Amino acid sequence: MQFDLRSNSATKLLCCSSTKGNKKQPPGKIGLNSIVIDSRIPYYFAVGGSDEYARVYDIRKCHWAASKDSDQPVNTFCPNHLTGSKNVHITGLAYSKSSELLVSYNDDLIYLFEKNSSFDSLPSSAACEDPKNLQETRVYSGHRNAKTVKGVNFFGPNDEYVLSGSDCGHIFIWRKKEAKLVRLMVGDRHVVNQLEAHPHIPFLATCGIEKNVKIWAPLGSDTPPLPSNVKEVLYVLS
């Protein structure tokens, strides 16, 4: 759906669908959990939901009453080992300032995908879901994403860090380039679901099961060490 603030009604853009089903969703329409716009190329937006694929659409090609081709993504991302999986779905997406796409999976990990060379020219067809076209890059692990819908985000003036909540109530911060965990903070007594960075200053807002929103800000330039119980907190995917 598209909402124009100048209009009193919403506009249907496309139907996100799949030809196969899984435990979470029967064949047909894909239930969506996350929609993000690429700020660098604002007519591209990515969606993720009840299957394993993050799909990228060009809003200029989206017309509800047009041909079926208008419902086809211009690109599709999925880790190779999850292609065809019936047990995972996407809970959160985020675009970096350089068009990298961050994808968080339920009962799995977080993956960073680069904008590949075929992004603009990939045919609008089922071939978009060919594993040969899917390029996995960095992987971020240690958090637990099972109980609720977890968001994911970037942090830093140049998106140097990756953020995620966890079922253990902690906020995880990894250095993007090395995929190395650098901060682990208690953000909720139960679960941390969402994290949002201020666009201009190093402030971070988080929320979870508790009835409040927490605002975080750095107190100094020194990076504190990880807590002594870090090994007890980290979740290892089996």
PLM features: what roles do these ranges have?
Residues 1-70:
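Solenoidal tandem-repeat scaffolds enriched in leucines and small polar residues
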Residues 17-22, 61-102, 106-111, 115-161, ...:
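Terminal intrinsically disordered, low-complexity extensions flanking WD-repeat/beta-propeller proteins
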